[in-house]
Curated annotation (Swiss-Prot):
Enzyme class: hydrolase
Enzyme Commission number(s): 3.1.3.15
Protein family: Belongs to the PHP hydrolase family. HisK subfamily.
CDD domains: PHP_HisPPase_Hisj_like
UniProt keywords, alphabetically: Amino-acid biosynthesis, Histidine biosynthesis, Hydrolase
Record protein name field: Histidinol-phosphatase
Pathway connected to this protein: Amino-acid biosynthesis; L-histidine biosynthesis; L-histidine from 5-phospho-alpha-D-ribose 1-diphosphate: step 8/9
Species, as recorded: Bacillus subtilis (strain 168)
Superkingdom, taxonomy of origin: Bacteria
A GO molecular function held by the record: histidinol-phosphatase activity
GO biological process assignments: L-histidine biosynthetic process
Length: 268
């Protein structure tokens, strides 16, 4: 099995570090990785307003061509040493499918490997970023009516992302399937049979659509998350279905490339 980190951010991330692309590549080589994918947060749909206070959830549209160009140069520089893939972490946002598809139709030809994630959930009056901070998550619980309702909306959104028609360049990998648990130590919740059923529907849809799962270790670095962003029972179900699992550090600084790769080897 190729040693690969399939979820890495870059200096183009407005809420990340200024570590250079080369620093990420060098860290990967130092840790014995053979392949990496840069998956910066794709620009959000033009008509969508980023609900975070600093509006820093994603790369600016104006930076996208330079991002692709710089990775292309790095690929040549590291040819024969490290396989580097150009990718994006694309947000699935309900009701913005047409804009997402247009974006993918435009930039998909330049991408090698991408992730489809859910960060934003719709409330009655707006969208909220579920992983921004604990205060926003508390607001989300209030807006949805209960913590179970937040989980239900999250997994319904994940399911919608999997079955959505987003064109031929739709990302093939589902990102951090339990990101909704980022603040679980502050807002404890054990999944009900209903929610577990929704997760199973998502896994069935991933299998049916020939998609992959992000084995995301960034939750181990989060104060309130409590672990890797996939529960053991989900992992077992995914393996039974032969869903490909791709290790992802979700590094936002070079030092986190390959973080807890041993957990991936042990469990996958």
């Amino acid at each position: 099995m190729q040693k690969r980190d399939g979820h890495i951010h870059t200096p183009f991330c407005p809420h990340g570090s200024n570590d250079t692309l080369r620093q990420y590549a060098e860290e990967a080589l130092k840790k014995g990785f053979e392949s990496i994918t840069f998956t910066e947060h794709a620009p959000l749909p033009p008509s969508f307003t980023d609900p975070t206070p600093l509006k820093d959830s994603a790369m600016a549209q104006a930076s996208l061509e330079r991002y692709i160009h710089e990775i292309s140069g790095l690929k040549k520089e590291y040819r024969g040493q490290l396989s580097i893939r150009t990718g994006l972490e694309v947000d699935y946002i309900a009701e913005f499918e047409d804009e997402i598809t247009l974006f993918l139709d435009t930039y998909g030809p330049y991408l090698d490997d991408s992730i489809l994630s859910v960060h934003f959930l719709r409330t009655d009056s707006s969208y909220l970023c579920l992983d921004y901070d604990e205060h926003t998550f508390k607001e989300l619980i209030s807006a949805c009516g209960s913590i179970e309702a937040v989980y239900e909306q999250y997994y319904r959104s994940i399911y919608s992302s999997i079955v959505a028609s987003l064109g031929v360049y739709k990302p093939k990998r589902v990102g951090h399937i339990t990101l909704v648990q980022k603040f679980i130590k502050l807002f404890p919740y054990s999944m009900s049979e209903h929610i577990r059923g929704l997760v199973s529907l998502c896994l069935n849809a991933i299998e049916e659509n020939g998609m992959e799962l992000d084995f995301n270790t960034s939750g181990l670095r989060k104060t309130y998350a409590g672990g890797i962003y996939i529960e053991d029972w989900m992992l077992n179900e995914a393996k039974q279905k032969k869903i490909p699992l791709v290790f992802g550090s979700d590094a936002h600084q070079a030092g986190d490339v390959g973080y807890a790769y041993e957990a991936f080897l042990e469990r996958c």
